[in-house]
C-alpha cells in the first residue's frame, strides 16, 4: 500500500557536518573496496616452485648468465610486474560510518515517502508490480523493517527498485536512490539508529 505522506525530519546538521563531503567519500570508498573482487593474480619468481639450483656455472660456458630457472625470462618462470590480487582495505570507524549515513539520509529527506509492503502469498514480480505505485525510471530505495522472503524474491527482477533492511542501511544506496520509500515499522528503527526524529 502507498500512503501519500511525507516525513519531516527534526534534525539540523551543524556547520561542521554540512561540509563533511570527505566523510561520505571515505564511507563510499570503504564499501566499494570491501566488495571488490581482486581476481587477477600472478606469481613472482620468488613464489614459483623450484629454481633453487643454478642452471649452469657462471663462467666458461659461453652462455648468458643464469641464476634460476624461474627467472621471468624463462619459460615457466615468474611474471615481472604482473597484476597482484592483493585486497586493499580502508578502515572506517563506527562513529564515522554512522555519521556518514546520517548525513546521506538528511540529504535525501525531501525524497522520502511512506510505502507499506503488501502481503504476498507467494513470490510474483507481476503481482508486486501491480500492487505497488508506478515506479519511476530513476532508482528507488525501499527501506523495510524485516526481510520478507516472498517480497524480496518478487522485487528482485525490478531493476529500479532496491530493498534493504532499516538496520542495515548505509551510504551507497542512499546516494544511489532518487526516491526513498519507508515502511511504518522501519521508522522507529531508523530513528534509533540515526538518532533523528521523524514525524508524518
From Swiss-Prot:
> Where is it localised?
Plastid, Chloroplast
Return one Gene Ontology term, BP aspect: translation
Q: Where is the composition biased (Basic residues)?
A: 51-68
Keywords, ordered alphabetically: Chloroplast, Plastid, Ribonucleoprotein, Ribosomal protein, RNA-binding, rRNA-binding
The UniProt GO MF terms for this protein read:
rRNA binding; structural constituent of ribosome
Q: Domain of life of the organism in this record? A: Eukaryota
What sections of the protein cross the membrane? none
**Which cellular components does GO assign to this protein?**
chloroplast; ribonucleoprotein complex; ribosome
Q: What is its main location?
A: plastid
Q: Where is this region: Disordered?
A: 45-71
In UniProt terms, what function does this protein have?
A: Probably binds the 23S rRNA.
Complex formation: Part of the 50S ribosomal subunit.
Similarity section:
Belongs to the universal ribosomal protein uL4 family.
List the protein's name: Large ribosomal subunit protein uL4c
High-level lineage:
Eukaryota, Rhodophyta, Bangiophyceae, Cyanidiales, Cyanidiaceae
What would be the name of the gene that encodes this protein?
rpl4
